[in-house]
Amino acid sequence: MVRRVLPAPPAAVWEEWLDAEGMAEWMCPRPARPTKIELDPRPGGELRIDIDDEGAELSITGRYLELDEPRRLRFTWSCSAWQPPANSVVTVTLTPHGDEQTLMTIHHAKLPPDVLDSHQNGWALIGEQLEARLTRGGQRTR
């Protein structure tokens, strides 16, 4: 589980999780970069993130399970690199914290044992990258 206080209210953080263009800036732990993000944010809607991880191409796919705006987001998560294939579940909880801040909690369940540590570290880096984007007011960098 990863927790991070972000410099924006829950509604603004929620929007980041549903905006493919903005998500391209923070979703993958650097140096990996998303090459394409497709989101259909509704229960049963699909998500897909194609990634270039220093020359290795992989895809994250899943389905939205729950969207409780702006509090809770749940979706399945499967990586094309996982052998054997597996489905895990990501739960993102957004709680008001202080003045115009959000406590974001990311819980990633049902992960294959061999990727537990890398995903824990990856979500921590993603939290840092999202914080940096929100600190800039959501402005894209190149």
Language-model segments: which ranges?
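Hydrophobic-ligand binding "helix-grip"
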Residues: 24, 28-29, 38, 42, ...
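Hydrophobic pocket/interface hotspot
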Residues: 13, 23, 47, 64, ...
